[in-house]
């Protein structure tokens, strides 16, 4: 079994969820025992898990083939949500994956999904309907330094190769995304995006991940590398919502 994602309940460190090609599993004892949550995958596998910030029974699970399932009763029943695959999606050597999801803590009905390699979709009604919000990324790819392709001849591919997104409780409605070309921010729920400019702090700009601290919503961590298959990597931290960043992986050997 290959575990693609692990998610921890913020208010209960012993409760974790693990997603794989075999299913969704839950532990309430810190990993000593696991239970299958009964999510039928078909030909899909799980790549992301998002927990509702206030309702412990509501969970979103992102799969490949641009599919998302949701439970509102702790896994007793699951609903396949009517997600959409953006027209700009670029299936390469694997189906488009829902690689990361985020729920706005200030309005949990707002759910956002980052697709690899496919762009960005959002729901403003708890997953009942979805919108393709990828066009702003396509527009950004028209800037010469943001044009990039590996799997296709589409210069927007790099901008649509989304790896992570997150929302901090300290910034309601503000979305951060990490993709192949760096870090990007939306101040209007994904209607428009601007390049953050992580290259001012790091020579490595391939965005792997970005996450807020569970202890301080003003703190973010960003993982960067040199390329999809490269060996170089770095870890940065901001304590002021991205106004400045410091590298924190000095003197670490893996």
Residue spans of the language-model regions?
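Extracellular glycan-interacting surfaces
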Residues: 1-254
């Amino acid at each position: 079994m290959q575990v693609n994602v692990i998610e921890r309940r913020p208010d209960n460190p012993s409760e974790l969820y693990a997603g794989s090609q075999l299913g969704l599993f839950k532990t309430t004892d810190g990993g000593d025992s696991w239970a299958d949550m009964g999510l039928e995958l078909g030909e899909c596998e799980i790549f992301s898990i998002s927990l509702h910030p206030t309702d412990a029974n509501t969970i979103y699970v992102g799969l490949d083939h641009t599919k998302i399932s949701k439970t509102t009763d702790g896994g007793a029943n699951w609903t396949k949500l009517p997600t959409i695959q953006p027209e700009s999606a670029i299936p390469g050597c694997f189906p488009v994956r829902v690689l990361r999801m985020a729920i706005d803590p200030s309005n949990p009905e707002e759910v956002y999904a980052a697709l690899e390699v496919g762009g960005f979709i959002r729901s403003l009604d708890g997953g009942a309907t979805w919108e393709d919000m990828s066009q702003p990324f396509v527009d950004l790819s028209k800037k010469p330094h943001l044009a990039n392709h590996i799997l296709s001849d589409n210069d927007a591919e790099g901008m649509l190769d989304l790896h992570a997104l997150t929302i901090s409780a300290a910034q309601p409605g503000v979305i951060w995304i990490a993709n192949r070309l760096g870090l990007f921010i939306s101040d209007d729920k994904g209607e428009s995006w601007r390049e953050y400019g992580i290259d001012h702090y790091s020579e490595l700009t391939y965005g792997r991940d970005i996450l807020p601290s569970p202890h301080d919503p003003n703190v973010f961590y960003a993982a960067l590398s040199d390329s999809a298959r490269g060996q170089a990597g770095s870890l940065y931290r901001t304590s002021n919502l991205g106004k400045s960043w410091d590298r924190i992986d000095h003197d670490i050997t893996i």
